[in-house]
UniProtKB/Swiss-Prot annotation:
<dbReference type="GO" id="GO:0045275">
    <property type="term" value="C:respiratory chain complex III"/>
</dbReference>
<dbReference type="GO" id="GO:0006122">
    <property type="term" value="P:mitochondrial electron transport, ubiquinol to cytochrome c"/>
</dbReference>
<feature type="transmembrane region" description="Helical">
    <location>
        <begin position="33"/>
        <end position="53"/>
    </location>
</feature>
<feature type="transmembrane region" description="Helical">
    <location>
        <begin position="320"/>
        <end position="340"/>
    </location>
</feature>
<comment type="function">
    <text>Component of the ubiquinol-cytochrome c reductase complex (complex III or cytochrome b-c1 complex) that is part of the mitochondrial respiratory chain. The b-c1 complex mediates electron transfer from ubiquinol to cytochrome c. Contributes to the generation of a proton gradient across the mitochondrial membrane that is then used for ATP synthesis.</text>
</comment>
<feature type="transmembrane region" description="Helical">
    <location>
        <begin position="178"/>
        <end position="198"/>
    </location>
</feature>
<feature type="binding site" description="axial binding residue">
    <location>
        <position position="83"/>
    </location>
    <ligand>
        <name>heme b b562</name>
    </ligand>
</feature>
<keyword id="KW-0249">Electron transport</keyword>
<dbReference type="InterPro" id="IPR005797">
    <property type="entry name" value="Cyt_b/b6_N"/>
</dbReference>
<keyword id="KW-0679">Respiratory chain</keyword>
<feature type="binding site" description="axial binding residue">
    <location>
        <position position="97"/>
    </location>
    <ligand>
        <name>heme b b566</name>
    </ligand>
</feature>
<dbReference type="InterPro" id="IPR048260">
    <property type="entry name" value="Cytochrome_b_C_euk/bac"/>
</dbReference>
<keyword id="KW-0479">Metal-binding</keyword>
<keyword id="KW-1133">Transmembrane helix</keyword>
<feature type="transmembrane region" description="Helical">
    <location>
        <begin position="77"/>
        <end position="98"/>
    </location>
</feature>
<dbReference type="GO" id="GO:0046872">
    <property type="term" value="F:metal ion binding"/>
</dbReference>
<feature type="transmembrane region" description="Helical">
    <location>
        <begin position="347"/>
        <end position="367"/>
    </location>
</feature>
Length: 380
């Protein structure tokens, strides 16, 4: 008799995606982050739903509604901190997932890669709008600075900013629409994640060697379900420790002061996971140039498949490219640090040098190094 997972139409779909899925036998723990991201997304949606039940998207009561959730709602404090720190874990997994794809050449699965970039943009937009909702000082001024960047667009910039704000300054309409979008976007992200998986299962996963694994595949369950559960336990351990022992470690103290349009904080900065892009934005003296650099810092990922000219897909056996990859990671960490510092010397200069290194490494050094490696191996 045929098992139900193979005969039932819905179960059959789940079976092909999670149970009998043919998977390369040599994929490492770096392939765990896809399932961890799915867990983070589910966690964010569940905790977000409970928070939305008590949150008030109104400038006069938003801040006090957050205080009410933390103090008065049963287990409200843990729901709030799981949501806030869950976002940080989400981005850690997201950056590691993208980093793994760059290192092992998974970006050559074009459809999967491009939907992944769209997911990254949507997640960043969702997180930014979520940062505005507590209506603290950093929420208000962060939203003011970032939305004001649209005014750099020639001709329509000012109108666009006022359209986003819903008035001549950030206020009630802005908070209301940001809450609506912050609530809706995770469901769009979930739908796009399904498309992302659909494209991945069309081609099959890449593997560390970057070679075809058609001749050596195993079923996803039980081998990789066990492996994913191990990753999940580690993630839960870190998230629980962060939430229970140091819940405000990654938050900004300024956000515990209610929003005041008449009092500017000494140093306006976004959440830690946007600091690298914020540092690139600040390193360009021209406003429009800064905005373009900001968007290009993420959009550059979409042209990486076109810049790939190595005879090997993975960097596993390419030491020169490996050096540049780790240079890129170091540059991003430097930019994250610079983004958290005030706009003064030597931080301005370090930020400009790091931004230049970031774009030069991806656009010039990596393709050149691939050509050198091809010649060293006498493959051309």
């Amino acid at each position: 008799m045929t098992p139900m997972r193979k005969s039932n139409p819905i179960m059959k779909m789940i079976n092909h995606s999670l149970i009998d899925l043919p998977t390369p036998s040599n994929i490492s723990m770096w392939w765990n982050f896809g399932s961890l991201l799915a867990f983070c997304l589910i966690l964010q949606i569940i905790t977000g739903l409970f928070l939305a039940m008590h949150y008030s998207p109104d400038t006069s009561s938003a801040f006090s509604s957050i205080a009410h959730i933390t103090r008065d709602v049963n287990h409200g404090w843990i729901i709030r901190y799981l949501h806030a720190n869950g976002a940080s874990m989400f981005f850690i997994c997201l950056f590691l997932h993208v980093g793994r794809s760059l290192y092992y050449g998974s970006f050559l699965l074009l459809k999967t890669w491009n939907t992944g970039i769209m997911l990254l943009f949507l997640t960043m937009a969702t997180a930014f709008m979520g940062y505005v909702l507590p209506w603290g000082q950093m929420s208000f001024w962060g939203a003011t600075v970032i939305t004001n960047l649209l005014s750099a667009i020639p001709y329509i910039g000012t109108d666009l900013v006022q359209w986003v704000w819903g008035g001549y300054s950030i206020g009630n309409p802005t908070l209301s629409r940001f809450f609506t979008l912050h609530f809706t976007l995770p469901f769009i992200i979930t739908a796009l994640t399904t498309v992302h998986l659909l494209f991945l299962h069309e081609t099959g996963s890449n593997n560390p060697c970057g070679i075809s694994s058609d001749s050596d595949k195993i079923t996803f369950h039980p081998y990789y379900t066990i492996k994913d559960i191990l990753g999940l336990i580690l993630l839960l351990f870190i998230l629980t420790a962060l939430t229970l022992l140091s819940p405000d470690l990654l938050n900004d103290p300024d956000n515990y002061t209610p929003a005041d349009p008449l009092n500017t904080p000494p140093h306006i900065k976004p959440e830690w996971y946007f600091l690298f892009a914020y540092a690139i934005l600040r390193s360009v003296p021209n406003k429009l140039g800064g905005v373009l650099a900001l968007f290009l810092s993420i959009l550059i990922l979409s042209i990486i498949p076109m810049l790939h000219n190595s005879k090997q897909q993975s960097m596993m056996f390419r030491p020169l490219s490996q050096f540049l990859f780790w240079l890129l990671i170091t540059t991003l960490l430097t930019l994250t640090w610079i983004g958290s510092q005030p706009v003064s010397q030597p931080f301005i200069l370090i930020g400009q040098l790091a931004s230049m290194t970031y774009f030069t490494t991806i656009l010039i050094l990596m393709p050149l190094t691939s050509l050198i490696e091809n010649n060293l191996l006498k493959w051309t």
